[in-house]
């Protein structure tokens, strides 16, 4: 189980895998001791999915990396409950509405089971995980880019129904250029309309 650590796609971090792995563990260990309210580790699986992996493969590789890091920290004698409550996961969100909801719900259950049964975490906060998501840039098309607003809306609604803590919507003109101020504003307003006008965020676990 060798961590990929952003070697999967567009990131160009030319460092030995073992060094990057150790550096990540050093950062988490330091933050767990000195920054008690800081989210010490974000597992970013976005580029796994954007590189062509399925939702299942995206989750699987993410859990491989999380497990590898936790084992390193436990090997140093660090208590799992000192850092586990502040692990976060950044997932991609594609256009498959119900699959993305299922992926996020499954991620929460698998994380809780892993922390409780595999790593013996006692603190109930260690059994939960903060999940954020960025909607798929690959879903944004260069043809008829205004239609991408609807794509971003559907992706965001699936994330709301899945119960993520934070959402970032890809800009509708992302396939054409560096996103404009207008497209950034549309992405922001899309979230605000879903939150404040649809009522979707007012219902706990609607599915």
What are the functions of these language-model segments?
Residues 111, 162, 190:
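Conserved, mostly hydrophobic/aromatic
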Residues 70, 115, 194-198:
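A generic secondary-structure signal for well-formed alpha-helical elements
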Residues 48, 133-138, 150-152, 168-171, ...:
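Anaerobic metallocofactor- and corrinoid-dependent redox/one-carbon enzyme cores
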Residues 114-116, 123, 141:
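Outer-membrane beta-barrel translocator/pore domains, especially the C-terminal barrels
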Residues 165-207:
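Active-site or pore-adjacent capping/gating segments
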Residues 154-159, 192:
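Short beta-strand elements
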Residues 1-94, 99, 118-121, 125-132, ...:
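Catalytic alpha/beta active-site cores
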Residues 52-60, 94-106, 135-149, 177-186:
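Short glycine/threonine-rich loop-to-helix capping motif typified by GTGT followed
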């Amino acid at each position: 189980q060798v961590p990929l650590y952003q070697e999967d796609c567009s990131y160009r971090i030319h460092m030995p895998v073992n060094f990057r792995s150790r550096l990540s563990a050093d950062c988490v260990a330091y933050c767990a001791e000195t920054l008690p309210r800081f989210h010490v580790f974000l597992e970013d699986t976005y580029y796994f999915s954007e590189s062509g992996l399925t939702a299942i493969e995206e989750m699987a590789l993410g859990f491989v990396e999380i497990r590898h890091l936790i084992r390193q920290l436990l090997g140093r004698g660090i208590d799992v409950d000192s850092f586990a409550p502040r692990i976060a996961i950044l997932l991609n969100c594609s256009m498959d509405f119900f699959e993305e909801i299922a992926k996020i719900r499954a991620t929460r259950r698998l994380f809780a089971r892993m922390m409780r049964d595999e790593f013996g975490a006692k603190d109930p906060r260690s059994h939960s995980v903060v999940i954020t998501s960025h909607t798929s840039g690959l879903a944004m098309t260069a043809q008829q880019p205004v239609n991408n607003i609807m794509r971003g809306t559907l992706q965001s609604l699936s994330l709301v129904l899945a119960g993520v803590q934070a959402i970032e919507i890809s800009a509708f003109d992302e396939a054409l250029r560096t996103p404009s101020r207008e497209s950034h504003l549309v992405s922001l307003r899309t979230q605000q309309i879903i939150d404040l006008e649809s009522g979707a965020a007012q219902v706990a676990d609607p599915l």
